[in-house]
């Protein structure tokens, strides 16, 4: 197994765990109404965005594990990595009012860099797979 495949598998496992955590946080936030204190009137929007981002992360994690194990199927991980990066940017923009509207969401920036690294590893595996065929 190449280094790119090993790295993609680790990144995909992290995605999988983060996806489950996002879904749990969104679910608990909706049920308990605890997101109101953080996001105020945008609480339901934040919960919906968090749930959608969790589903995308979960799907990217599954596709990444699948692609790391079987390189011919890594295209799904590549595409879901792009969707995850877009979803992270959307989450940062939609939850910006919670930070006063003028703050920089450094957490979202770090996650976008992580998303791009995931995409790059999936692309490397696609290139390796092309070379082998």
Predicted regions span which residues?
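Loop-to-transmembrane helix junctions at the membrane interface
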Residues: 56-88
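Cationic, hydrophobic amphipathic alpha-helical membrane-interacting segments
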Residues: 21-27, 66-72, 93
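A loop-to-helix transmembrane entry motif
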Residues: 39-56
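Membrane-cytosol interface at the C-terminal ends of transmembrane alpha helices
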Residues: 53-69, 109-126
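Cytosolic juxtamembrane helix and N-cap/initiation of the first transmembrane helix
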Residues: 1-31, 37-42, 124-128, 132-133
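Membrane-helix boundary connector in multi-pass membrane proteins
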Residues: 87-107
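Juxtamembrane "helix-exit" motif on the non-cytosolic side of transmembrane helices
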Residues: 27-35, 93-100
């Amino acid at each position: 197994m190449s280094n790119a495949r090993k790295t993609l598998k680790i990144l995909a496992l992290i995605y999988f765990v983060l996806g489950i955590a996002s879904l749990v946080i969104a679910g608990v936030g909706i049920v308990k109404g605890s997101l109101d204190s953080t996001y105020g009137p945008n609480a339901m929007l934040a919960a919906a965005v968090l749930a959608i981002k969790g589903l995308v992360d979960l799907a990217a994690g599954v596709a990444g594990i699948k692609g790391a194990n079987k390189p011919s199927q890594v295209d799904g991980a590549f595409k879901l990595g792009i969707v995850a990066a877009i979803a992270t940017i959307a989450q940062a923009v939609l939850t910006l009012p919670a930070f006063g509207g003028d703050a920089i969401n450094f957490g979202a920036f770090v996650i976008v860099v992580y998303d791009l690294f995931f995409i790059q590893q999936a692309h490397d595996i696609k290139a390796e797979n092309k070379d082998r065929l």
